[in-house]
């Protein structure tokens, strides 16, 4: 397909070589353009949505073929008809595709959100907080279920105060696109712009196939500026800095906690397997939890048929609060 788009990108700035390459490209484009439209559509349908948009610029006849329902139905998920309103039946398949790419659809009683990646047509999901297993999530003293207008879902989970932080989720491999590398993110924000207890102590994230050893990493919900780190290292609401060294020496477990914090700080400074948050265009933040691959058989290489995701901090005993979790997002890994 490269020959359709123009001359040799490695050629010099001018001269006979460039003209020769352009002539070859035009000739080959003309030959492709001379094919019957349904034949052109068949070829394009085996590429990607991005490629279809690119080749549409070759000529009017190729554009017509590239925008045909034959092409865009191949890019749509097989279950698309159940995901769109009946009022959308008059739309072309390309318009339906773009609608699913630009606007996510709530599925499974509003507990999941579905859309397709515009460039590839790959399936994407967000598991709402209601779909996750949150330890103490049904105890109002620890977690509160609230409504926020900027969320995709009816309810999100607000962390009030816990020392045992554990969130888990699962998704079936069959719901995702085959032959695809996926990345997993937790989507969150902080209550009143601030959380407590997540600055010095990392959270352990795990992603893997059920029944297999998960790939783990340390993640932070806070960006990690020095002022925030020094102000909010808490144990039961008491700043660690307020506890004397002599007092800690009489309680070895507190010394271990401090050593773990210093080790994590060293990892963060060295840029090791520690990941921080990034802001999203929708006003939320996200942290990457891990990656996995769905093979061409629609499952893991070991035959597993379900992905499990975990986010935990249960070792240090420090109190944590102020986090609002919208859900866990699973989308194709971005290629560079």
UniProtKB/Swiss-Prot annotation:
GO terms for molecular function: carbohydrate binding. Signal peptide: none annotated. Its main location: nucleus. Pathway: Protein modification; protein ubiquitination. Pfam families: F-box, PP2. It comes from the Eukaryota. It is found in: Nucleus. One of its GO terms (cellular component) is nucleus. Residues 29-75 form the F-box domain. Coiled coil: none annotated. One of its GO terms (biological process) is protein ubiquitination. The keyword Amino-acid biosynthesis does not apply. Component of SCF(ASK-cullin-F-box) E3 ubiquitin ligase complexes, which may mediate the ubiquitination and subsequent proteasomal degradation of target proteins. The F-box is necessary for the interaction with ASK proteins. This is F-box protein PP2-B1.
């Amino acid at each position: 397909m490269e020959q359709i788009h123009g001359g040799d990108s490695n050629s010099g700035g001018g001269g006979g070589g460039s003209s020769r390459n352009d002539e070859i490209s035009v000739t080959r484009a003309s030959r492709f353009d001379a094919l019957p439209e349904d034949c052109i559509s068949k070829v394009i349908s085996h590429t990607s949505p991005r490629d279809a948009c690119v080749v549409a610029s070759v000529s009017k006849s190729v554009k017509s073929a590239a925008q045909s329902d034959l092409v865009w139905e191949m890019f749509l998920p097989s279950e698309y008809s159940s995901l769109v309103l009946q009022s959308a039946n008059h739309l072309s398949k390309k318009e339906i595709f773009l609608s699913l790419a630009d606007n996510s659809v709530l599925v499974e009683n509003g507990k999941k959100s579905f859309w397709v990646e515009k460039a590839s047509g790959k399936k994407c999901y967000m598991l709402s907080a209601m779909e996750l297993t949150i330890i103490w999530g049904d105890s109002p003293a620890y977690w509160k279920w609230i409504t926020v207008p900027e969320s995709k879902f009816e309810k999100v989970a607000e962390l009030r105060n816990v020392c045992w932080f554990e969130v888990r989720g699962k998704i079936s491999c069959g719901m995702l696109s085959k032959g695809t590398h996926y990345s997993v993110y937790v989507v969150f924000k902080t209550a009143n712009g601030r959380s407590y207890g997540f600055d010095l102590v990392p959270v352990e994230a795990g992603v893997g196939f059920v029944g297999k050893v998960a790939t783990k990493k340390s993640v932070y919900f806070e960006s990690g500026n020095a002022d925030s780190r020094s102000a909010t290292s808490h144990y039961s609401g008491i700043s660690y800095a307020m506890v004397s060294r002599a007092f800690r020496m009489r309680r070895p477990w507190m010394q271990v906690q401090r050593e773990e914090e210093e080790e994590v700080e060293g990892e963060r400074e060295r840029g090791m397997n520690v990941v921080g948050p990034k802001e999203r265009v929708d006003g939320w933040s996200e942290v990457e939890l891990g990656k996995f691959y769905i093979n061409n058989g629609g499952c893991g290489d070991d035959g597993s048929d379900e992905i499990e995701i975990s986010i935990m901090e249960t070792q240090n005993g420090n109190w944590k609060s102020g986090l609002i979790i919208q859900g866990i997002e699973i989308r194709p890994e971005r290629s560079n």
